[in-house]
Amino acid sequence: DVDRSRGLGDVYKRQRLERAYGYVFQAPALLAWRTIERNVGLPLEIMGLSAVEKAERVARTLDLVGLDGFGRKFPWQLSGGMQQRASIARALAFDADLLLMDEPFGALDEIVRDHLNEQLLELWRKTGKTICFVTHSIPEAVYLSNKIVVMSPRPGRVTDIIESDLPTDRPLDIRESKKFLDIAQRVRNGLRDGHSYE
């Protein structure tokens, strides 16, 4: 429902004020001088929530991402994967319907990345949030998605939209299944179609 008399900037500003979406960056972007619970609670402070409601939401989201008991730690006291989970908790804290994630696991080693992929799927099942996840990893895209939008580089355009019929319950070994590999090949073909090497 967009008011055509207003510019898109006004629409985006309204969405920001209404907290229509949460955003998770490539790097955790945690403030070093704030504890994890104060980092997670920052958007709630900005929104003007009461101390009681803020504490409840922070505790709930830290528990949701598996960081219960780490709220009083500082970012430097956590591993890279734990810092990224704190960043996800911060994005979830104000209860937006849409979570935008820009390569949040790109800098992590493969084992930690696999673990966070499993946790993100579980988080999605628990919350029902819409998650838009940007990645350059074909296996990660196929594992996490029920819809994959394949894009070309410069200029960015959609080369394919793939509806995944993988089951909602996805153990890591699903990546060895024929269905998974077929979807991954279709993603690869879409990427290849969008690239020019001339």
Question: How would you name each of these model-derived features?
Answer:
Residues K73-W76, F94:
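Conserved signature/switch motifs of ABC ATPase nucleotide-binding domains
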Residues Q26-L31, S137:
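Catalytic "switch" loops of ABC-type ATPases
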Residues G41, E45, V52-F70, E122:
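Conserved ABC ATPase "signature" region
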Residues I88:
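Hydrophobic anchor residue at the start of the ABC signature
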